Regions:
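Short, flexible micro-motifs
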Residues: 27, 59, 69, 114-116
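Hydrolase catalytic cores
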Residues: 39-105
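Divalent metal-coordination and catalytic microenvironments
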Residues: 35, 67, 111
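C-terminal domain-closing interface element
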Residues: 105-125
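Subtilisin-like serine protease catalytic core
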Residues: 1-3, 14, 23-32, 74-92
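Catalytic-core environment of secreted peptidases
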Residues: 9-62
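Residue-level recognition of conserved structural "scaffold" positions that shape functional pockets
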Residues: 31, 63, 73, 118-120
Length: 125
């Protein structure tokens, strides 16, 4: 849908894309993914109080969902933009994405760039 946001995974230590992540644009020309979020060798809780590492776009999606929740809190709960929508989230997250100067955006690998929630909130200030 127009309000959904697609995300790919990257290794935050060296900014390399997750090799198993899909790449490319949709047949209708829509950009997917829209952003990249950390999703490689992420520390996760395991059973019995243990921790381990995991990789995958589901971890990137979880971080992006958390970012969306923070944006909705800022907009709706705190009264800054009471009519905030999913499209608003996508717009702010893609506008706030970090981009490499040597690349053209959007592109089939990174979409609009690496999600940068701090920069997104700077745009809102």
């Amino acid at each position: 849908s127009l309000e959904s946001i697609t995300v790919t995974a990257y290794q935050y230590r060296d900014n390399s894309l997750y090799v198993q992540a899909s790449r490319g644009f949709m047949p209708d020309g829509n950009v997917v993914p829209q952003v990249a979020a950390p999703g490689v060798q992420i520390r996760i809780p395991l059973l019995n109080g243990l921790y381990g590492n995991a990789s995958g776009t589901s971890l990137s999606a979880a971080q992006t969902a958390g970012a969306a929740a923070l944006l909705f809190e800022w907009a709706v709960i705190r009264g800054n933009q009471p009519y905030f929508t999913g499209s608003s989230v996508k717009n702010y997250i893609t506008r706030g994405a970090e981009r490499e100067e040597r690349m053209q955006y959007p592109n089939r690998d990174w979409g609009f760039g690496r999600m940068d929630l701090y920069h997104t909130f700077e745009l809102l200030a």
